[in-house]
Amino acid sequence: MRNVTLILDDGSRFHGKSFGFEKPVAGEVVFNTAMTGYPESLTDPSYAGQLMTLTYPLVGNYGVPPFTLEPNGLATFMESEHIHAEAIIVSDYSENYSHWNAVESLGDWLKREQIPGITGIDTRELTKVLREHGVMMGRIAFDDESDEMPEASYADVNYVDKVSCKEVIRYNEGTGKKKVLLVDCGVKHNIIRCLLKRDVEVIRVPWDYDYTGIAFVADSFIRTIVHIDE
């Protein structure tokens, strides 16, 4: 494992080891206190552009499930089609995993998706820093590379456009008792799944959809939100 350093905007440095894809990245450093669910969290579009810190001490011990689609086109075990977080930061990564539904390790999945992972970080101390000073930008640098990489800025990237669908997608078409227009600004698949379980027809449209020529009447309107800093 290569040495890697997480550098925060306030100058704080946290040293660890790499277990994912090896590339320098930058983004907003945030934390997640869930004990399980890293496949769902990593594929959640609301984490786009962020370095995700997991406070639970042991991560990876139940591996990663297969990527499969339900008949309606939704991911069975994940919240979207791919990882959206820029990186994952953990205290203790387990390469060995055991779960009836696991097909690969977290590290192998990260490498395949080209997402960095850091282990050996005091994630609870890092969380204290973020809790006391607020989330801040940070960057990941490897031991043999310059840590003077450009700082990330949300103003440079339209994350809503990145995570939104590119065309209209219909679910339960013609069969739902109610019709919902869902504006996709970074929707989790489980939100759509919950609507479908309630016998709702969902019309999922891109964030910049042109409503002037709309050819249907919806009973409700939902707009999903992805986190953006101006």
Predicted features and spans:
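Cysteine-nucleophile active-site neighborhood
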Residues: 216-230
